[in-house]
C-alpha cells in the first residue's frame, strides 16, 4: 500500500490533512444517513488526495477526472485496490458530466441518485507532468514545445508561437503571464519564427533571456516562468474551463455538499474568488434588514478569504508555498434555483438528496445548471457595474 503522504508514485499531495478536514463533514453526514458519498476529483493527477479520501472515508466513492490519458491510466491501476469505489474519466474537468452520460458503474449510479457530496480541484500543472521533459511544460530542460495536458488533441505551444499574430501573442503573455515585456517578446517571437519555426523549449528560453533586460531578470524568479505559464494556459484553455466548472460542479452538490479549490497562481485564484462570491451573494437589494423570499444565496463560504499552507507544510512540500484554498458549501435550494433537473428522493433530518429524472444525465440537469450559471454571471455583471460607479 502506498504511503498516504508520499505514495509510491513519489507525489506529495499539498495540504492533504486540511483537504480531508474540509471534505469530512459532508462525507460523514452522508455516511450517517446510509447514503453513499460521491466525491468528484476534477484534477486526479497522481491520485494522492483521492487515495486519502478513499482510505479515510470507507463509505466514499470517487469520480476521478483527468485530461492526461497516460497519467489517468497509471493512477487508475494504482487505485485498483479500491475496486468499485473509484471510477476514472478521461475528460476536461468542465465536461465531467457529459462524459458520464453513457457510463454504467456503481459510482455513477450513486452520483445519479444522490448528486455530489464534494467537488475537489487541485489546479494547475502537476509536478509529474513538469518532470516529463517530452511534455514541454518545463523551461529548465530542452524539450518539444507541446504543453498539452491531453496529448491526443488540440494545438501545441509551438502552434501558438508559429501562428498567432504579434497582437495575440502580446495579449496572452500579458493576460496569462503578467509579463511586463509582453510586447518586445511577441515581436521577437514573430521575428525568429520567420527564420525557423518554433519547436523546442531551450530556443525559447534563450530568446527570453536575450529580450528581457538584465536588471529585470534579477527579480521575480526565472525569467521564462511567466511566458511558459501563459502558453500553457492558452494551449489548455485552463481559465475558460475553470470559469465553467465552478457553477457547474456546485449545481450537483446536495445539501451540505462542499466544493474545494486549490489555486497556485493569481489568475486562477481571482476566478475562483469571483465565481464563489457570485454564488454566495444575496439577491436582496442592499439596505434591507432580511433576505427577501427566494433571494437568499444557496451557498456560503467555508473558508474566510483564501487559506494558505502553514510553515510545516511549506517545509515538507515546496509546491505548497503558492497555494490558495477556497471552499463553499450548499445550504439550500431557492425556488428559482431548484435541485438541477431532479425530484426529491430521500429526506433525513436536515439533509435531502435527489435523483435525476429519466433520460440522459446531461439533459436531466441542464435546466438547473444553466440557471445557476446564469445567476452567477448576473451577479458578476452587477458587481462590475457597482464597482465601475464607485
Curated annotation (Swiss-Prot):
Positions that bind S-adenosyl-L-methionine: 47-49, 66, 93, 122, 129
Record localization: Cytoplasm
GO CC annotation terms, alphabetical: cytoplasm
Biased composition (Polar residues): 348-358
Major site of localization recorded for this protein: cytoplasm
Entry EC no(s): 2.1.1.199
GO BP: any one term: rRNA base methylation
Residue ranges the record marks as coiled coil: none
UniProt superkingdom: Bacteria
First-level EC class: transferase
Keyword annotations from UniProtKB, A to Z: Cytoplasm, Methyltransferase, rRNA processing, S-adenosyl-L-methionine, Transferase
Function: Specifically methylates the N4 position of cytidine in position 1402 (C1402) of 16S rRNA.
Family listed: Belongs to the methyltransferase superfamily. RsmH family.
PANTHER family per the UniProt record, alphabetical: 12S RRNA N4-METHYLCYTIDINE METHYLTRANSFERASE, S-ADENOSYL-METHYLTRANSFERASE MRAW
Entry protein name: Ribosomal RNA small subunit methyltransferase H
Gene: rsmH
